């Protein structure tokens, strides 16, 4: 056998196949530590403020029948006509990833007869929503929102409550540089005369074909056109605020008066038109100039008639959606961070195999007592393990090695006071449960 043949007989080492690293789809953000803690803190702050105002949590599907949004949001809107993720499921049904929250909440209220009980029905929800938009700073294809809906009562005091609640949500995370813009879109009886005047005005403008189509379907949608050249042409357009009925005007004046009483500042923006067709009467938006062109951080309004349009009772409602992603960007623009608190109360450092076995039990007992606890894994030394305690933001570190095991003790380090004490191993769980409870109570 030749040398060449011998080489060929030798088993060849299999080459490890190199896979291309995957990334998230375009326009879909990841939230990983430490940003994920800030994301959760903002979402929790918004939700807690709503719970404190009597709103109950509701959990809804990520996708719905497409017809829900076509009927509820409006077929002439950009959301329905251009931005929805719509597909046929395996049964041939057209379904859509939810682009907004109100229509789904209303569907659930009708389906589960929540409107047959105590009114108003006050609900809060949170989670991801989906719109196929051109990704840019502050505008994602998967956006995160917290929203509330108050359904069943046509009362301007409820409008004021909802707006003040949204204002409180942003204040609760330390945001300062936001503004509230407010208007009234009138009721359905106010619309026909105004619609005709607006269409007459639009007919005098050199509109492109798509905008002409929109002007015929729903002329208010034209006012939502953000192109600078369109905004210039629309400068002299008739205003809905000038065409309100007496009852709609009284409703709006009551809302603004209540906001004045509550100390909630606002600017009346008569040209505001939100991108959803169901809004009536009170309509509002919170903006932050630190976000540039995508300045909206949340908004909402009243939607009288939506429930009937979706097959339910003819009950009114009002709500808002606040952007968690946008709020984080607004905090960043103010050079602030959402307050996240510490990850754990106690961090265990075990030096040696037997110490690790004992530390696993101590950490589990602490968790059983309601104390948040973690420990060092792998074979890091004391210095490396203590870095883990610092990164976790722990109040206390427990150090357990051969010396402590032999003496039946454990070293408890108070990381805030920079003090340490030897504590009986059998008593350490009880001691730390008491200490962390006291620290939490006085935080």
UniProtKB/Swiss-Prot annotation:
InterPro entries: aa-tRNA-synth_II, aa-tRNA-synth_II/BPL/LPL, Anticodon-bd, Anticodon-bd_dom_sf, His-tRNA-ligase, HisRS-like_core, HisRS/HisZ, HisRS_anticodon. GO terms for biological process: histidyl-tRNA aminoacylation. GO terms for molecular function: ATP binding; histidine-tRNA ligase activity. Residues 1-21 are annotated as: Disordered. Residues 1-20 have a biased composition (Basic and acidic residues). It catalyses: tRNA(His) + L-histidine + ATP = L-histidyl-tRNA(His) + AMP + diphosphate + H(+). It holds the Pfam family tRNA-synt_His. Keywords: Aminoacyl-tRNA synthetase, ATP-binding, Cytoplasm, Ligase, Nucleotide-binding, Protein biosynthesis. PROSITE patterns: AA_TRNA_LIGASE_II. GO terms for cellular component: cytoplasm. CDD domains: HisRS-like_core (cd00773), HisRS_anticodon (cd00859). It is found in: Cytoplasm. Homodimer. PANTHER family: HISTIDINE--TRNA LIGASE, MITOCHONDRIAL-RELATED, HISTIDYL-TRNA SYNTHETASE. This is Histidine--tRNA ligase. The lineage of its organism: Bacteria, Bacillati, Actinomycetota, Actinomycetes, Mycobacteriales.
């Amino acid at each position: 056998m030749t040398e060449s043949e011998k080489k060929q007989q030798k088993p060849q080492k299999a080459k490890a196949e190199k896979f291309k690293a995957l990334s998230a789809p375009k326009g879909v953000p990841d939230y990983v530590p430490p940003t994920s803690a800030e994301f959760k803190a903002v979402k929790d702050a918004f939700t807690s403020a709503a719970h404190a105002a009597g709103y109950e949590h509701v959990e809804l599907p990520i996708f719905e029948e497409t017809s829900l949004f076509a009927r509820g949001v409006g077929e002439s809107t950009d959301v329905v006509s251009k931005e929805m993720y719509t597909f046929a499921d395996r049964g041939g049904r057209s379904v859509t990833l939810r682009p907004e929250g109100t229509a789904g909440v209303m569907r659930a209220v009708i389906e589960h007869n929540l409107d047959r009980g105590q009114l108003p029905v006050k609900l809060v929800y949170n989670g991801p929503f989906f719109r196929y938009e051109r990704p840019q700073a502050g505008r994602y294809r998967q956006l995160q929102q917290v929203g509330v809906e108050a359904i069943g009562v046509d009362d301007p005091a409820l409008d004021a409550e909802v707006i003040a609640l949204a204002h409180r949500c942003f204040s609760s995370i330390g945001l300062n540089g936001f503004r509230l813009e407010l208007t009234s879109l009138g009721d359905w009886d106010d619309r026909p005369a105004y619609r005709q005047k607006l269409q007459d005005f639009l007919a005098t403008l050199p509109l492109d074909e798509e905008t002409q189509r929109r002007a015929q379907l729903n002329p208010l949608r034209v006012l939502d056109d953000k192109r600078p050249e369109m905004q210039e042409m629309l400068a002299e357009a008739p205003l809905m605020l000038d065409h309100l009925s007496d009852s709609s005007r009284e409703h709006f004046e009551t809302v603004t008066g209540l906001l004045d009483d509550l100390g909630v500042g606002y600017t009346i923006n008569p040209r505001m038109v939100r991108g959803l067709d169901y809004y009536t009467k009170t309509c509002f938006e919170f903006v932050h100039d630190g976000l540039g062109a995508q300045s909206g951080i949340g908004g909402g309004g009243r939607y009288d008639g939506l429930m009937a349009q979706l097959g339910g009772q003819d009950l009114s409602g009002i709500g808002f959606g606040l952007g968690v992603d946008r709020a984080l960007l607004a905090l960043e623009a103010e050079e602030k961070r959402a307050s996240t608190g510490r990850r754990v109360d106690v961090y265990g450092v075990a030096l040696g195999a037997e110490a690790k076995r004992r530390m696993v039990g101590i950490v589990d007992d602490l968790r059983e007592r309601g104390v948040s606890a973690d420990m060092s894994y792998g074979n890091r030394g004391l210095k490396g393990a203590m870095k883990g305690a610092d990164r976790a933001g722990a109040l206390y570190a427990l150090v357990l090695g051969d010396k402590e095991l032999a003496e039946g003790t454990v070293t408890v380090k108070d990381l805030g006071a920079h003090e340490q004490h030897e504590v009986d191993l059998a008593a350490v769980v009880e001691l730390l449960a008491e200490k962390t409870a006291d620290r939490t109570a006085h935080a």
